[in-house]
Amino acid sequence: MASSQGKNELKFADWMATLPESIHSIPLTNLAIPGSHDSFSFYIDEASPVGPEQPETVQNFVSVFGTVAKKLMRKWLATQTMNFTGQLGAGIRYFDLRISTKPRDPDNELYFAHGLFSAKVNEGLEEINAFLTDHHKELVFLDFNHFYGMQKYHHEKLVQMLKDIYGNKMCPAIFAQEVSLKYLWEKDYQVLVFYHSPVALEVPFLWPGQMMPAPWANTTDPEKLIQFLQASITERRKKGSFFISQVVLTPKASTVVKGVASGLRETITERALPAMMQWVRTQKPGESGINIVTADFVELGDFISTVIKLNYVFEEGEANT
């Protein structure tokens, strides 16, 4: 029997648990799942050094202007305002994670990083795990897609960290089309870890990065972004992987200079939001439709509820399969 929890009465912290029963056996590759871009960037440590992936021009800029430069960088690097717990409670289930070592760090810790450093990785993963323990029918996609300054032993440390924190909650890598809510619930799995490194081939619970493609438009133009998103979905492989639609605009250097004091949210994201949300509303999930949809500042424009509600086309018999 279908859940009595209607799409207009969503409980975002438990939205997967309350999906209609008719959706439980559909592969997760065919569902619409909201995610966040640079998920960890709600916290950026302005006291930290610049990330090792930053070009020399940025390094020089910070060395000359110091804290002022970092404060300006933060306005353009922070793409989220909610922490992991807040994002999860609001319905986010995919996390875009970028990991780095920190130069001259005596503790040799691993950090989330994008331009500047964020929180320690173990703290973020523990925060996500606490939510999963309290919401045992919800699941998350952890996508480790960039690694900076990491040697073999750093990867080994991260793999062990995942084991220690998530243990039997992690679903081993299998054929993606076999993974449904019903399958995961029966086995008490709640975590799918995607790892964009050859290390993934050596560890059963790491899904290879190519099973989570995320085409990047790299544009500040909402119209070009939408054209790119639509073309990417059209070219999506019919089977075999998950798929990310990044509803994200990327600032050029000239854009940053013009809006240097206002930042990403005010200069780009909020202005383009109506056009981007209109595109999301017109989509359908399915083999040749959307799957995971990511955005900056996920609390804006009913983004999360809009993506979740797309799943109800399955109940209405209109799925794009």
From Swiss-Prot:
The active site is at 37, 114. One of its GO terms (cellular component) is synapse. InterPro entries: PI-PLC_domain (IPR051057), PLC-like_Pdiesterase_TIM-brl (IPR017946), PLCXD1/2/3 (IPR042158), PLipase_C_PInositol-sp_X_dom (IPR000909). Keywords: Hydrolase, Lipid degradation, Lipid metabolism, Transducer. It comes from the Eukaryota. GO terms for molecular function: phosphoric diester hydrolase activity. Residues 22-197 form the PI-PLC X-box domain. GO terms for biological process: lipid catabolic process; signal transduction. This is PI-PLC X domain-containing protein 3.
